[in-house]
Design a protein with these regions (language model features):
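A glycine-rich helix N-cap at a beta->alpha junction
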Residues: 76-91
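Phosphate-backbone binding interfaces of nucleic-acid-interacting proteins
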Residues: 531-652
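Cys/His-rich short segments
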Residues: 115-168, 172
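Beta-strand segments within the central parallel beta-sheet cores of soluble alpha/beta enzyme folds
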Residues: 287-290, 474-476, 576
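Intrinsic disorder at enzyme termini
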Residues: 470-551
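N-terminal catalytic cores of NTP/NDP-binding nucleotidyl/phosphoryl-transfer enzymes
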Residues: 2-75, 94-109, 114, 131, ...
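Helix-rich, typically C-terminal accessory recognition domains appended to large enzymatic cores
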Residues: 120, 343-380, 391-499, 609
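Structured secondary-structure scaffolds
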Residues: 1-48, 100-104, 148, 154-369, ...
Length: 652
C-alpha cells in the first residue's frame, strides 16, 4: 500500500545575517512535525532554504565590500550549518539563487503578464527596505512600517503591478469554505478584517531602483519583487514548470499540506501567495500556520537592542536536544513564548536532568544492582501496575491528537507525563524496600520491567522532538526502535534483556551562576558603550516645551480594567477596548494591534488618560487614551500598575 504524502515547508530564511534562536525555532518546529508524520507512516517531504534577493541584501553586500552573490553564499552557508546543527531532517534546502528557481520565476512572471494579471505602471508610495514591502501613507503607523516599526522611505519608479482585486472575492470564498486554511483562527480574522474585506490594492511586483534580483525576462531593467520570487520556491523546489512538463515529484506533492511561517508574514502567505497560485491555475496549500514569536526576556530579539541569542551558543551550553526541548516545549500555540538563559537552566535541571535523566539513570542502576542488568517480567503484579500501564497506554492517543492540531508544546507535555508517572511509580513501589526481602525478588523484577517498558514507550514518543535523546535512551536499555502502532501494547520489551552496565548521564545539572558568568564573557558590554545598570536600555528623546504644574494638573490619569477588546474593522493597527474605570465603562481605541492580540488585552489593568475630549479614530468613538511606552525599535508595552490597584484608582 502506497504511503500518503505529506509536504511541509518553512518560510525560507532571509539571508541578511546570521539567524538567531527566534528564527531557528521555526525550522525545529517544522522538523518535529515532519518527524512525527514519518512516525505515523506518511511519505514526508520537508523543504526549507534561503531567500537571497532584494535591496536590503544589495546594501548589506555593498557595506561588506563584496558582491551580493558572495554575501548570500556566506550567509546561506551559515544558515544551513545551523539548521544541520539543530538536527533538522529536511529533504531539500532550496536557494532562490539556484539556476532552476530563477529560470522558473522568469517564466511564472511572463505567464502572469500574458494573462493580463500583471500590467505596467508607475509606483509612488512608501517602501520598507528591511521588510521589502510597499505601503501607502495611510497604511503607515506613526509614519513607520506597520509590520516592523522601522522608518519607510519614499519610492517612485516605473513598475509592474499585479491585479490583486481580480482574485479577492475568490480568495474570500475559499477562506470561508476552508476553515482550517489559516491557523490559528485569530490570524484568519486579522487577514479578513484588515486586508480582504476592506478591499485589496494592486501589488507592485517589480523594482528598477536596484539590481540584485531576478530580471524580468522581457524587460530586464526590472527585477522581480522579492516576495513573488521567494513565495514561488514552494513549487519550483519540487519541479514545477509553468509552460512545460512539471516533474512527477511536483504532481505527487502539490498542494502543500502545511506552510509553517512566522505570524509577521502571514499576509504574504495567505493573500499574495494564494492569489499568485490562482493566477497559475494551481490548487492552494491545505493549511498555513502562523506561529508566534520566541522572544527574549525583554522583548523581540534585535541586534540593535543587543539581546540576540544564537542557536549555536545555546547548543554549546546545553546540547542540541535540550535546545530543541526548550523551543518546542515553551512555545504556546498562539501567543509569544519567552527564552532566557535563566529559564533554560531551570528547565534543563528540573525537567531534563531530574524528571527524565534521573529516571533513566535510577532504573538502569537498580537493574544492575539487583539483577546484574537483566530485566525480566516475572508477572508478580499489583493494582498499582495496572494504574501505570493504563496511564501510559492512554498517552499516545493524546499526543497524536495534539500533533494533528499542531499543538506541539502540548504534545511534548503529554510525553513527559509518562516520565513523571514512572517516577511516581518508583515512589509507590519502593524498589529499595522490596530488595530487602528475598521473597519479594520476583515482585522487584516486575517493577523494574514495568519501568523499563514505560521508559521505552515514552522514548518512542519523544523521538520526533528529541531524536538523539531517544536513541541514547534505547541504546542504554538495549531496546529496539518501535512504531507508533506498537504503543498500543504494554510489554513488548523482551523479558531477559540486559541493560547497559554503566548508565550514561543524559543531561548534567548546570549551575546558574556559572552559566551566567560564561554568558557575560560571551557577550561583554561593548567597549564604546558603558555597561548599563541592570542591563536596562535607555532612550534619549528630544525635549518638548516645558509646561506648568497647572497645565499638567488638567490631565486626569486613572487605572482601568479592560473587560472586552475587539479589532477595528478597516484598520491595520487599531484595537477597540471596553475599559472599566470605577463604575463606568468607556470605549477606548488604541494603535497597538501589532503588539497585542485581543485575547491578551482582556483582563489587563492599564493606565488611562480619562479626561481627553472624545474623538473618532477610523470612524470609531474613543473616550480616552491607554498609555504605552515605546522602545528604539518601535515595540510598544502597556503601562500597568506595579501593584494590584482597583479599576478607577487615581494615578498621581
Amino acid at each position: 500500500m502506497e504511503k500518503q504524502k505529506y509536504y511541509i515547508t518553512t518560510a525560507i530564511a532571509y539571508t541578511s545575517g546570521k539567524p538567531h534562536i527566534g528564527n531557528t525555532y521555526e525550522v525545529v518546529l517544522a522538523d518535529a512535525i515532519a518527524r512525527y508524520k514519518r512516525q505515523q507512516g506518511y511519505d514526508v517531504f520537508f523543504q526549507t532554504g534561503t531567500d537571497e534577493h532584494g535591496q536590503k541584501i544589495e546594501l548589506k553586500a555593498e557595506e561588506a565590500g563584496i558582491t551580493p552573490k558572495e554575501f548570500v553564499d556566506n550567509v546561506s552557508g551559515e544558515i544551513k550549518r545551523i539548521w544541520d546543527l539543530m538536527n533538522t531532517s529536511y529533504d531539500k534546502f532550496i536557494r532562490t539563487t539556484d539556476e532552476d528557481h530563477e529560470k522558473q520565476v522568469k517564466k511564472i512572471f511572463k505567464k502572469m503578464y500574458a494573462k493580463s494579471d500583471i500590467y505596467k505602471g508607475h509606483y509612488e508610495g512608501m517602501y520598507c527596505t528591511p521588510c521589502e514591502s510597499f505601503f501607502t501613507e495611510s497604511q503607515l503607523v506613526d509614519g513607520k512600517c506597520p509590520d516592523c516599526g522601522r522608518p519607510c522611505v519614499p519610492a517612485k519608479e516605473e513598475a509592474y503591478f499585479f491585479k490583486m482585486s481580480k482574485y479577492a472575492d475568490k480568495l474570500i470564498d475559499y477562506i470561508n469554505t476552508h476553515p482550517d486554511f489559516i491557523q490559528p483562527e485569530s490570524r484568519k480574522n486579522e487577514m479578513m478584517n484588515n486586508f480582504l474585506l476592506p478591499g485589496l490594492q494592486d501589488l507592485c511586483v517589480s523594482r528598477t531602483s536596484f539590481k540584485w534580483g531576478i530580471p524580468v525576462d522581457f524587460d530586464p531593467k526590472h527585477v522581480v519583487y522579492v516576495w513573488l520570487d521567494a513565495l514561488t520556491n514552494y513549487i519550483t523546489g519540487i519541479g514545477y514548470d509553468c509552460d512545460g512538463e512539471s516533474t512527477e515529484q511536483f504532481k505527487k506533492l502539490w498542494p502543500a499540506d502545511l506552510h509553517l511561517i512566522g505570524k509577521d508574514i502571514i499576509r504574504f502567505h495567505t493573500i499574495y501567495w494564494p492569489i499568485f497560485l490562482m493566477s497559475l491555475d494551481l490548487p492552494l496549500p491545505k493549511q498555513v500556520f502562523g506561529h508566534p514569536w520566541l522572544l527574549q526576556g525583554d522583548g523581540k530579539m534585535s541586534k540593535s537592542k543587543g539581546n540576540v541569542i544564537y542557536a549555536d551558543e545555546l547548543v554549546d551550553f546545553f546540547g542540541v536536544d535540550a535546545v530543541r526541548y526548550f523551543v518546542l516545549h515553551e512555545m504556546p500555540f498562539e501567543n509569544d513564548g519567552v527564552i532566557t538563559w535563566e529559564l533554560m537552566v531551570e528547565r534543563l535541571n528540573s525537567e531534563l536532568a531530574n524528571t527524565l535523566g534521573n529516571l533513566v539513570n535510577r532504573t538502569i542502576s537498580m537493574s544492575n544492582k539487583y539483577f546484574g542488568g537483566v530485566v525480566e517480567n516475572k508477572g508478580v503484579t499489583e493494582p498499582v501496575d495496572d494504574d501505570l500501564k493504563n496511564f501510559i497506554l492512554s498517552v499516545p492517543a493524546k499526543v497524536n491528537e495534539k500533533m494533528d492540531k499542531l499543538r506541539v508544546a502540548d504534545a511534548m507535555t503529554e510525553v513527559f507525563t509518562i516520565f513523571k508517572r514512572c517516577n511516581k511509580y518508583i515512589d509507590e513501589t519502593m524498589p529499595w524496600a522490596l530488595a530487602k526481602d528475598e521473597e519479594k525478588k520476583d515482585r522487584l523484577a516486575t517493577v523494574l520491567y514495568n519501568l523499563v517498558e514505560g521508559i521505552c514507550i515514552g522514548a518512542t514518543l519523544l523521538k520526533s522532538f528529541m531524536p538523539e535523546t531517544t536513541e541514547r535512551i534505547l541504546a542504554q536499555l538495549n531496546a529496539q526502535d518501535r512504531e507508533l502502532e506498537d504503543l498500543k501494547t504494554f510489554g513488548l520489551y523482551p523479558s531477559g534483556n540486559k541493560v547497559t552496565e554503566k548508565p550514561e548521564i543524559l543531561f548534567a545539572r548546570l549551575d546558574l551562576k556559572e552559566v551566567m558568568a560564561k554568558v557575560a564573557e560571551l557577550h561583554p558590554p561593548k567597549a564604546e558603550e558603558p555597561a548599563k545598570e541592570e542591563n536596562e536600555d535607555v532612550i534619549d528623546l528630544e525635549a518638548k516645551p516645558e509646561i506648568t504644574f497647572e497645565d499638567f494638573g488638567k490631565l486626569q490619569f486613572q487605572v482601568g480594567k479592560i473587560i472586552k477588546c475587539e479589532e477595528v474593522k478597516k484598520s491595520k493597527k487599531l484595537l477597540c477596548s471596553q475599559v472599566q474605570i470605577g463604575s463606568q465603562v468607556r470605549q477606548i481605541v488604541s494603535g497597538i494591534k501589532a503588539h497585542y492580540s485581543t485575547e491578551e488585552m482582556v483582563g489587563k489593568k492599564v493606565m488611562v488618560v480619562t479626561n481627553l475630549k472624545p474623538a473618532k479614530l477610523a470612524g470609531v468613538l474613543s473616550e480616552g487614551m491607554i498609555l504605552c511606552a515605546e522602545d528604539a525599535d518601535g515595540n510598544l508595552s502597556l503601562m500597568v500598575p506595579e501593584k494590584e490597584m482597583p479599576a478607577g484608582a487615581e494615578i498621581c
